[in-house]
Amino acid sequence: MNPLSVGNQAPAFTLLNQQEKFVSLSDFRGKKVLIYFYPKALTPGCTTQACGLRDSKSELDVLGLVVLGISPDAPKKLAQFIEKKELNFTLLSDPDHQVAEQFGVWGEKKFMGRTYDGIHRISFLINESGTIMQVFDKFKIKDHHQMIIDYLRSL
């Protein structure tokens, strides 16, 4: 696994959202975008991370940030995640993990003595022209949203 780094151009992509509508990164040209990769909808860690972003949405809006969550889950599962947890941002389905691979976040993981391939929990902050301006790869899940807010405030 070799995640993209600061200064790299974010790869162009188009994925289905929770409403089974196509969303492209280029739709947000001219805006700052947080692309956060997470392993699986409606699991404890992913729910904590998503709810932190949900609860910070008004502040993230003031800071001019668009939030896009990407996982291998199907659009129907993403819709359930949004409904059950009242999420207020877009989730995208990457079932074949092609976008995760382009960003370098798909790779070997170990959990409970088992080794498998999956998404690593890494977030990319992309500037208005599509360049990666920050990579968040070491954080406590419960602090993810605050770390992003603190970074944006420091600019």
UniProtKB/Swiss-Prot annotation:
Pfam families: AhpC-TSA (PF00578)
Record domain Thioredoxin: where: 4-155
Enzyme Commission number(s): 1.11.1.24
Top-level taxon: Bacteria
Active-site residue numbers: C46
Disulfide cysteine pairs (residue numbers): C46-C51
Enzyme class: oxidoreductase
One MF annotation (Gene Ontology) recorded for this entry: thioredoxin peroxidase activity
GO cellular component: cytoplasm
Keywords: Antioxidant, Disulfide bond, Oxidoreductase, Peroxidase, Redox-active center
UniProt keyword Transport, yes or no: no
Record field: catalytic activity: a hydroperoxide + [thioredoxin]-dithiol = an alcohol + [thioredoxin]-disulfide + H2O
GO BP, sorted A to Z: cell redox homeostasis; cellular response to oxidative stress
PANTHER family named among the record's database cross-references: AHPC_TSA FAMILY PROTEIN, THIOREDOXIN-DEPENDENT PEROXIDE REDUCTASE
Family: Belongs to the peroxiredoxin family. BCP/PrxQ subfamily.
Additional facts recorded: The active site is a conserved redox-active cysteine residue, the peroxidatic cysteine (C(P)), which makes the nucleophilic attack on the peroxide substrate. The peroxide oxidizes the C(P)-SH to cysteine sulfenic acid (C(P)-SOH), which then reacts with another cysteine residue, the resolving cysteine (C(R)), to form a disulfide bridge. The disulfide is subsequently reduced by an appropriate electron donor to complete the catalytic cycle. In this atypical 2-Cys peroxiredoxin, C(R) is present in the same subunit to form an intramolecular disulfide.
Its job: Thiol-specific peroxidase that catalyzes the reduction of hydrogen peroxide and organic hydroperoxides to water and alcohols, respectively. Plays a role in cell protection against oxidative stress by detoxifying peroxides and as sensor of hydrogen peroxide-mediated signaling events.
Subunit structure: Monomer.
Protein name: Putative peroxiredoxin bcp
